[in-house]
């Protein structure tokens, strides 16, 4: 009896993309440090050996995912025939394509904001170079839209545009397609066209270092500062208590007189930011009765804390998933309550703004504030808090033609 020939199983042409897609999903869901190559291979339905044909290691997968997302932004600036570099165009001409890139790559944005520190030095440098190129392109477009802005003012407005677009990667909120595009367009243009609030002279060198040394008045504060700095730089899973103690200048068991574990330090950091945010919310509501003044006060409070404690803000953005369930859930619940106050005030000031639209605008404004606070060189100017507040208010009230320019 003749044997029946078995059909030849051919390797899918897009296997490399399938592997990358599965890796992206796992990195976003669990965090880079918690995903193993075996997990990615299993999710993609391939063997580990097959995965290695396409990617050398987990870092190579992460680098490719981040590059893919950033390339979508860079390719949004169109080339005309014969060009090797795109000619800058006013923001209103490029914005439709930038919004399309933001929507298409929203799942990838979180990777370059949260996970890029796990790349090797060469890949991290490439990520920073591409981010700088993206923002520089937006700055050129802003200057063509609003001539005569200073370098500092134009760069902040470019970051406002960039953060508004990339804020989509920090949440799962959405709107119907055209409504979302219109909201993003109005918010970006409102920020770009916001007149300068004040001059931005450079701060004296060394001020920040002196301020930091002055506030570390106790073992507790020193350990919190060291923990926040290390968690931000290396990621919570990669840091141990010995490193925190060393970073704080505290040897051996001295750390445990203040904290029982690394987990306790992270939880204390998240609780602290939560309580500070709540206090600023209370202050803004007590000090003001009018909706416009209340919203301005809320924004100014958020800016103040973000500039005062950038490491703390960074930890809340990148390490929240590692906090204990009780602390994480409490933080998210309180954050939702605080943002509901912002949304209610936006609705009073701009009645045409729906609750769903308000949520997206609040997410965009907060993303901008926290992105700037975590970008050192942008914060080294006197008056930058007022400038950030004015731009955030422009985003929040963009449905009303910049009602609350500060």
Swiss-Prot record:
HTH tetR-type domain span: 13-73, 217-277
Null allele phenotype: Cells lacking this gene result in a significant increase in the expression of mce3 either in vitro or in a murine cell macrophages line.
Keywords: DNA-binding, Lipid degradation, Lipid metabolism, Repeat, Repressor, Transcription, Transcription regulation
InterPro entries named in the record: Homeodomain-like_sf, HTH-type_TetR-like_transc_reg, HTH_TetR
UniProt keyword Magnesium present: no
UniProt-recorded Gene Ontology molecular function terms: DNA binding; DNA-binding transcription factor activity; transcription cis-regulatory region binding
Induction conditions: Negatively autoregulated.
Record-level GO BP terms: lipid catabolic process; negative regulation of DNA-templated transcription; regulation of DNA-templated transcription; regulation of lipid metabolic process
Pfam families: TetR_N
UniProt DNA-binding residue ranges: 36-55, 240-259
Function comment: Mce3R represses the transcription of mce3 operon and down-regulates its own expression, but does not affect the transcription of mce1, mce2 and mce4 operons.
Protein name: Transcriptional repressor Mce3R
Encoding gene, per UniProt annotation: mce3R
């Amino acid at each position: 009896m003749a044997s029946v020939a078995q059909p030849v199983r051919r390797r899918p042409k897009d296997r490399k993309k399938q592997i990358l897609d599965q890796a992206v999903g796992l990195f976003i869901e669990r965090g880079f440090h918690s995903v193993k190559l075996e997990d990615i291979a299993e999710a993609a339905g391939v063997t580990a050996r097959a995965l290695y044909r396409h990617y050398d290691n987990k870092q190579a997968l992460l680098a490719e995912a981040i590059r893919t997302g950033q390339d979508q932004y860079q390719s949004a600036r169109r080339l005309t025939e014969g060009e090797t570099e795109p000619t800058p165009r006013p923001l209103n001409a490029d914005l439709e394509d930038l919004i399309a890139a933001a929507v298409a790559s929203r799942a990838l944005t979180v990777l370059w904001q949260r996970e890029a520190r796990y790349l090797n030095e060469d890949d991290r440098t490439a990520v920073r170079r591409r981010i700088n190129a993206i923002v520089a392109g937006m700055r050129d477009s802003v200057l063509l839209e609003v001539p005569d802005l200073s370098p500092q003012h134009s760069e902040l407005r470019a970051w406002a545009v960039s953060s508004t677009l990339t804020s989509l990667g920090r949440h799962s909120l959405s709107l119907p397609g055209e409504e979302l595009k219109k909201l993003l367009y109005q918010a970006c243009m409102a920020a770009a066209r916001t007149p300068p609030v004040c001059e931005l002279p450079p701060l004296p060198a060394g001020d920040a270092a002196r301020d930091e040394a002055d506030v570390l008045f106790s073992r507790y504060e020193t350990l919190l500062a060291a923990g926040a700095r290390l968690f931000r730089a290396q990621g919570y899973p990669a840091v141990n208590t010995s490193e925190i103690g060393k970073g704080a200048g505290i040897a051996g068991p001295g750390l445990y007189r203040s904290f029982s574990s690394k987990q306790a330090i992270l939880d204390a950091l998240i609780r602290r930011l939560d309580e500070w945010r709540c206090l600023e919310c209370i202050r803004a509501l007590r000090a003001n009765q009018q909706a416009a003044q209340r919203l301005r006060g809320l924004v100014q409070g958020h800016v103040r804390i973000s500039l005062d404690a950038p490491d703390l803000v960074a930890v809340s953005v990148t390490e929240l998933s590692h906090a204990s369930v009780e602390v994480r859930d409490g933080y998210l619940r309180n954050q939702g309550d605080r943002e509901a106050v912002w949304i209610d005030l936006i609705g009073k000031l701009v009645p045409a703004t729906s609750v769903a639209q308000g949520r997206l605008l609040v997410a965009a404004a907060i993303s901008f504030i926290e992105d700037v606070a975590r970008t050192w060189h942008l914060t080294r100017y006197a008056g930058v808090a007022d400038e950030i507040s004015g731009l955030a208010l422009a985003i929040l009230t963009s449905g009303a033609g910049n009602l609350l320019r500060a």
